[in-house]
Amino acid sequence: MSLTLTPSRQLPEVDAFIQCAMVMEAQPFLDALVPLPGSHAVETLVVGADGHHQQSYALGQLEGHTVVVITSGIGIANAAAAVARGLTLATPKIVIAGGTAGGLEGGIQVGDIAGAISTIYNDADATVFGYELGQIPRMPVDYHSSQRAIDALAGLNDAQPHHVRTGRIVTGDSFASEKVVARIRAGFPDALAVDMETCGMAQVCWSNGVDWICLRAISDLTGEGADEDFHMNGEKAAYHSFEAICAYLSLFCK
């Protein structure tokens, strides 16, 4: 038997990966998936040891688009690992972060869609070595969506019922309590929203030359009281993201 680290086959192409942290966020997509033509069921792969953290991949069609719905688990490492593994299974035209996020910028409202086209880590600090706040050493300052991905956002407000705000989302592994939000706002005053996954996903996409965008619904406004209250039911916010992503796919893939 010969040993090789070279991929032995051409990876199938799909329209999109849709990365969600939690089953609650992924469920609207999973409910809407139908089998690919010629298949009898949606193909599902679960990776991870029994009794430990597991990540799932569901391949099917979503309103005519071939997608892989990835349920990664919460946090930067889980999102990065899940998308990196996904890229060994298929080649997407774009990776879309779905689900929920916390609103930061004053004009964003609960239920709005954070159409994030740039992202940076909110808790990375290598400034002592001359890097920008939020920048990982030897990586870009932040990560940006392509012009094609940005252009597809232009019609999204008219294509679905939720208001879309375009800007930057910041990512960290700390829940957005009042203390954490004060630090984030001081360091990243232009940030639209905060989550725990998008930048990890975007870094993997950048490393592999794959496009990405984030279309998360705002479930709460961060800061005072954020550790006690969600201002919109999580399932409802996740459905807002689902509706926005379905509409976006039609705009991006046309």
Task: Please give the residue ranges for each predicted region.
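N-terminal short beta-loop-beta anion/metal-coordinating cradle
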Residues: 2-81
